[in-house]
Curated annotation (Swiss-Prot):
May interact with both microtubules and actin cytoskeleton. Residues 226-268, 385-440, 478-798 form a coiled coil. Residues 875-889 have a biased composition (Pro residues). The lineage of its organism: Eukaryota, Metazoa, Chordata, Craniata, Vertebrata. Its main location: cytoplasm. This is Cytospin-A. Residues 333-343, 946-961 have a biased composition (Polar residues). Keywords: Cell cycle, Cell division, Cell junction, Coiled coil, Cytoplasm, Cytoskeleton, Gap junction.
Length: 1132
């Protein structure tokens, strides 16, 4: 990207004065009008921000300048945070606060401009009026003073306006420079994303290095005259940015075309995303306006929906999905998200840029303002929401990928340990196989010796005419009687146990109810006692109050008595004084008047004092009487209340006593019932113990009877086997060699067919391998980092399969090559030699001896039709994840048609998605009996060769039958021909070697059963393919299909609301979980219902409800362990 970085000169340094400042102000006004010409700077969805910043930066006050600086600082801070996180594609917008700030500053700037314009007009009017008044009336000095004041104010306002315009222009230039830097950061982010997409797609990086943008020289002082040159500089930078964006758009379209060529259906995904979010189509050809935000939403929808048909996963697996290809599909969908989002984000501003350029060239200001208002709001909000959703989706993908990687590492460690165990088991099985072959030879010799003894004993019995038939009816009747008796005893014991359990449960329930009633009665008694104590306390309080009132009453009575005594004394004194007055009157009448006057005065004073005392005492007496009356009324009231309260308390006490007596009686009855129940429980427990002892004794008797019955059955089977062997040897001694010869011919022909089929499969595999390699090479050039590990795994599996097939063919060649040794048999067969030679020649060159092979095949088919009359055709198995073609007849059919039938049954009984590696041990089990047969043919006489070869063949047949889990003991018809003889021989050999622990089950089936018993997810991984974690995840997705609000993509965040657990358990236990009533908000209820439903069937909860409720991403291993336990309980 090229940018023009011109140094900004200080043009206004030489000039000064009012003229320059006025000119600068006019220029600033012009530049303010021309400010929409800088609209091409909005190439990356920032046209609204630029215009808002330009409008907001022209404020005329210091507050508006401060606000503009604050918005600029927040904008630069957001840009810095965006440069620190280049992976997240967030746009550098100043946010809603910045928009509100710019809108406020724009309003303030408009209002300041209007005030400035009005002040200038008013000042000019005042100046003209004052000039006229000076010329007309030079007398008025006051008018002159006003004119000078107005001139000074006008000059001051002009200077203030010029300064405010200068500061506003400087802030505007700073905002424009900050926006240009933010656009540089956005373009660098787009470049980094393009580079990441190239790395993810495996494209070679371009050798040519783009020119680094030169740093701008910071201007020390930016004056108002520099705004026009700065705008021109920004226009040139916008042109450079436009060219760079066009270049990036072309590169993105080229990448999109390549992705379309690779099979990514971009239009279908975009249409699906538009339908999902309700947006118009955002194809590259029709992208305009706010298509960037729509593109982001579309990519989010596509990432949620997953990979569509025809994606990279379909190209790699050909319709079979596995865990490894799931990783590839998720990564390719992430690549597609990056491409589409960047392309749509670049397509969208092109339309905006063209419209803004057309508006700057000739559009009216109304159109510019309408476009500015229409484009702001939707793009920022929608883009922020879509980017937030996309970041959340990327975090989910990252967590899922890390979870899958951890699970894969754990499974790899488990597989390494299993491989070591299987290697040790394979060595042990090889040793056991050698021991079995030796024991087979010994058993065949022993069987031959026993046959001779039985023949001798039978000849003796025939000579003496002794009947040696076994009384089977009596034994069978006795056995049936014992079995019927055992069934009856078991039924009776079970019935009695259920009855005793029912009685015990009933008694325990009754005991619990009695205990509850007792507890309630005790509570009632305690409550009544507490109430009684409370009443007693109230009674004591009332008694104390009554005593205090009585004491107060006594005191009042004493005071009244004292007052009455004092009143009587006063009356006596009054009478005495009256007498004295009468005497004094008499003395006055008789004697000196002066003395009498003095005495009268003294007496009058005494009288007044006595009257005052009398009135005072009278008042005190009245008060005392009123108090006594009040106290008497109060005392009467208290007496009445006390009597009422006492009666109520006595009634309540009587009721409480009656209730307590009743409760005591009930308690005694309950205690007696509890004692009776305990005695009954003890008796029942004694009876249960007796029944258990009787049952144990009966079980011992039954086990003894079963052991004796098994012994009798073994003896019976031994006798039957010996009789069958004697019958076959007496009647079919001459036909055994012909039968063996026909079987050997059939075996050779079938081995040849198997070899040709194996070669065809190898050819098909090599052809498919070559095609896959070509396809992988073609795709590997474009997505190397994604494909390398998966391709190595596929190659390793294919190579392992080829090596296994080659090893199996080598074992077959080794087993069949031994037959070319010179035979020392007394009866050589030229037909067998001819077949062996034809087989060897067919192994060296399949096309050279086609006639001999066809003749051998026809002869073998005829022999098979003669010997075996009813055989089931081998059905081809379904395709496995590693096999390119349907599996044909397994090589285990190379021994005889009967063994072919048994192996066909075992393969049909096996699981349909089992791999070929699980069936490899059966190849070696085939080659050993033939080798042993040919070795025995070189060392033994003809009769021993016939017997031992038949026994070895029957031994292999028996092992294969037991591996197919369909044991057939008694398949024998005395007069059934050669086929029946072979079947009887096989059962006899199987029973004779039943002492060996490994002869009853095929090692492959045994190892598989042990593996499934240890790890229940092994069968699931074989069924779905891929790792165990992905297989269990797909099983959960399959079980929860059709459930709403369920999207299982991992084992952590997909299970944090409990609905996934409820959905999985609802498929098995619908009565325990009301799924329609659940929601994702009530997490605790969801987890509680799910865990209770699982515990009701015996699945122990290993998760804590509190941790699950409060954790956004629970431990995926714990969740996977719990889900595994659910799968193990319901599916295994």
């Amino acid at each position: 990207m090229k940018k023009a970085g011109r140094p900004v000169g200080n043009k206004a340094a030489s000039g000064g004065g009012k003229g320059d400042s006025v000119t600068a102000g006019n220029c600033a006004g012009k530049n303010t009008v021309k400010s929409p010409t800088s609209a091409p700077l909005s190439k990356v969805k920032s046209n609204d921000d630029l215009l808002a910043a330009m409008a907001g930066s022209s404020a005329g006050t210091n507050n508006s300048v401060a606000k503009g600086k604050k918005s600029t600082s927040t904008h630069s801070t957001s840009c810095g945070t965006n440069t620190n996180n280049p992976d997240t594609k967030t746009k550098t917008t100043s946010g809603p606060s910045g928009k509100r700030t710019t809108s406020m500053t724009s309003k303030e700037s408009n209002s300041s401009r209007e005030r400035l314009r009005n002040s200038r007009n008013s000042s000019s009017k005042k100046q003209s009026s004052t000039g006229a008044s000076d010329r007309a009336q030079p007398k008025h000095s006051r008018a002159l003073a006003q004119t000078s004041d107005s001139e000074s104010r006008m000059s001051k306002s002009k200077s203030d306006g010029q300064l405010s315009d200068k500061v506003a222009l400087e802030a505007k230039v700073k905002n424009l420079l900050g926006l240009a830097k933010s656009k540089d950061v956005e373009i660098l982010q787009l470049r980094g994303e393009l580079r990441d997409m190239r790395v993810q797609l495996g494209l070679p990086e371009e050798d040519e290095e783009e020119e680094r943008p030169p740093e701008r020289e910071a201007a020390a002082v930016i004056t108002a005259a520099d705004v026009e040159s700065t705008l021109l500089l920004l226009q040139e930078q916008n042109q450079a940015i436009r060219g760079e964006l066009n270049l990036l758009k072309n590169e993105n379209r080229m990448l999109k075309d390549r992705l379309n060529a690779l099979g990514f259906s971009l239009e279908q995904r975009l249409d699906g995303a538009d339908k999902t979010f309700g947006f118009p189509s955002t194809s590259p050809e029709l992208s305009s306006g706010g298509a960037g935000a729509h593109g982001d939403c579309a990519t989010v929808a596509s990432s949620v929906e997953g990979s569509a048909p025809g994606s990279m996963e379909d190209l790699l697996t050909g319709g079979q999905r596995s865990g490894s290809t799931d990783n590839l599909d998720s990564e390719s969908s992430e690549v597609y998200q990056a491409v589409t989002s960047s392309d749509d984000a670049l397509d969208a501003p092109s339309g905006c840029g063209s419209s803004s350029s057309s508006e700057s060239e000739g559009g009216p200001p109304a159109c510019r303002s309408s476009s500015r208002k229409g484009s702001s709001g939707n793009t920022s909000e929608v883009s922020v929401a879509c980017l937030t959703e996309r970041i959340h989706q990327m975090e989910e993908n990252q967590h899922s990928t890390s979870e899958e990687l951890q699970a894969t590492l754990q499974e790899l460690a488990d597989l390494q340990q299993i491989t070591q165990e299987l290697n040790g088991e394979n060595e042990r099985l090889g040793e056991e196989k050698v021991l079995l072959m030796d024991s087979l030879c010994q058993q065949s010799d022993k069987l031959e010796h026993c046959g001779r003894q039985i023949e001798y004993f039978r000849s003796l019995l025939d000579e003496h005419g002794v009947a040696y038939s076994v009384d089977e009816d009596i034994k069978s009747g006795r056995y049936m009687e014992l079995e019927q008796r055992y069934v009856e005893l078991a039924e009776n014991a079970r019935f009695e146990r259920e009855q005793l359990l029912g009685v015990q449960q009933h008694l325990s329930n009754t005991l619990k109810m009695a205990e509850q009633d007792n507890a309630e009665a005790q509570n009632v008694i305690a409550a009544l006692k507490e109430r009684n104590h409370h009443m007693e306390r109230l009674l004591d309080v009332e008694r104390q109050e009554r005593a205090s009132m009585a004491a107060v009453l006594e005191e009042c009575k004493a005071a009244v008595n004292n007052d009455q005594a004092e009143l009587s004394r006063c009356r006596v004194l009054l009478e005495q004084e009256r007498q004295k007055v009468a005497e004094l009157y008499s003395i006055h009448n008789a004697g000196d008047k002066s003395d009498i006057h003095q005495l009268l005065e003294g007496v009058r004073l005494d009288k007044e004092e006595a009257e005052a005392k009398a009135s005072k005492l009278q008042d005190d007496l009245g008060h005392a009487r009123s108090e006594v009356a009040c106290l008497q009324d109060t005392l009467n009231k208290l007496d009445a209340e006390y009597r009422d309260f006492q009666s109520v308390v006595q009634k309540e006490l009587a009721e409480q006593k009656r209730a307590i007596e009743k409760q005591r009686e009930d308690l005694q009855e309950k205690e007696t019932e509890i004692g009776d129940m305990k005695e009954t429980i003890f008796e029942l427990e004694d009876e249960v113990e007796q029944h258990r002892a009787v049952k144990l004794h009966d079980n011992l008797i039954i086990s003894d009877l079963e052991n004796s019955m098994k012994k009798l059955q073994d003896q019976k089977h031994d006798m039957e086997r010996e009789i069958k062997i004697l019958h076959r040897r007496l009647r079919e001694e001459s036909a055994e060699w012909r039968q063996f010869q026909a079987d050997l011919q059939t075996a050779v022909v079938i081995a040849n067919d198997i070899k040709s089929e194996a070669q065809e499969e190898i050819g098909d595999l090599r052809r498919r391998l070559q095609e896959a390699q070509e396809k992988n090479e073609k795709l590997g050039k474009e997505i190397e980092e994604v494909k390398n590990r998966k391709q190595d795994e596929e190659r390793g599996r294919v190579y392992n399969y080829m090596n296994a097939v080659e090893r199996d063919l080598a074992a077959l060649r080794q087993g069949m090559g031994l037959s070319r040794r010179p035979s020392t048999s007394s009866e050589p067969s030229p037909t067998v030699k001819t077949l062996i030679k034809s087989f060897d020649s067919a192994s060296q060159g399949p096309g050279a001896n086609a006639t001999a092979v066809a003749a051998a095949a026809a002869a073998a088919a005829a022999a098979a039709a003669v010997t075996v009359t009813s055989t089931t055709p081998t059905a081809p198995l379904p395709r496995t994840p590693l096999s390119p073609s349907p599996m044909k007849t397994p090589p285990a059919a190379a021994v005889s048609p009967i063994q072919r039938h048994s192996i066909t049954g075992s393969m049909a009984a096996a699981k349909p998605l089992s791999s070929l590696a699980d069936k490899r041990p059966s190849y070696t089990d085939i080659s050993m009996p033939a080798e042993h047969l040919l070795r025995a043919a070189n060392s033994r006489p003809a009769s021993a060769l016939q017997r031992v070869s038949n026994m070895d063949t029957s031994k292999t047949i028996t092992v294969s039958r037991r591996s197919s889990e369909e044991p057939k003991r008694d398949i024998s018809t005395p007069d059934g021909g050669p086929a029946s003889s072979l079947i009887s021989m096989s059962s006899a050999a199987a029973l004779s070697s039943s002492s060996s622990p490994t002869a009853s089950v095929n090692p492959t089936a045994r190892s598989r059963l042990r593996e499934e018993r240890k790890d229940p997810l092994s069968a699931l991984a074989r069924e779905y393919g891929g790792s165990k974690r992905n297989a269990l995840l797909r099983w959960c997705q399959k079980k929860t299909e059709g459930y709403q609000n369920i999207d299982i993509t991992n084992f952590s965040s997909s299970w944090n609301d409990g609905l996934a657990f409820c959905a999985v358990l609802h498929t098995y236990l619908p009565a325990h979980i009301p799924y329609q009533e659940l929601n994702s908000q009530d997490k605790r209820r969801n987890f509680t219902l799910a865990f209770q439903a699982a515990e009701s069937v015996g699945i122990k909860s290993t998760l804590d409800i509190t941790d699950m409720v409060h954790t956004e991403r629970p431990d995926w291993q714990s969740v996977m362990t719990y889900v595994t336990s659910i799968y193990k309980y319901f599916e295994t």
